[in-house]
């Protein structure tokens, strides 16, 4: 019998690896959001509270959007580096960062140097000060909408 894995087995293994990467990506996004107040988006698509298949579908959509594949594995690698940095509360587009990483990968010898270079000005920004807001006459839906807009 042939010891080489069949095309089916290779594809099955690849899909399992993608799903594992998706699970790790969700954990990193949750850690960034809940521990560091860093919101991650993928070309303006919310990533928090998404399941693995939604994350993978968003990556496929992002690849179609920019005309170049956006890999979940690259997104995980960049998100992992963001988690290791001390960044202020922010909203970051990991799709844009992953796309730029592919465009400029010859400039950087690893992902960490890319992320540090791209986010170096983040620490220079003014700190966000919380501000209480009272909304009258909006109702429950209006308050939910206002919360999303802030």
Where are these regions (language model features)?
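N-terminal ligand-binding/catalytic initiation module
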Residues: 1-129, 148-150
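Glycine-rich adenosine-cofactor-binding loop
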Residues: 127-149
């Amino acid at each position: 019998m042939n010891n080489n894995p069949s095309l089916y087995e290779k594809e099955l293994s690849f899909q399992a690896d993608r799903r594992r990467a998706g699970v790790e990506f969700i954990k990193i996004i949750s850690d960034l959001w809940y521990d560091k107040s860093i919101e991650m988006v993928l070309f303006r698509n919310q990533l928090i509270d998404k399941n693995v298949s939604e994350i993978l579908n968003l990556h496929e959509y992002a690849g179609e959007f920019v005309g170049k594949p956006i890999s979940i594995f690259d997104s995980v690698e960049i998100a992992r580096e963001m988690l290791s940095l001390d960044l202020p509360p922010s909203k970051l587009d990991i799709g844009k960062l992953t796309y730029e990483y592919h465009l400029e990968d010859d400039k950087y010898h690893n992902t960490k140097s890319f992320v540090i270079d791209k986010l170096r000005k983040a620490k220079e920004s003014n700190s966000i000060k919380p501000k209480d807001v009272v909304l009258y006459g909006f109702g429950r839906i209006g308050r939910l909408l206002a919360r999303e807009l802030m």
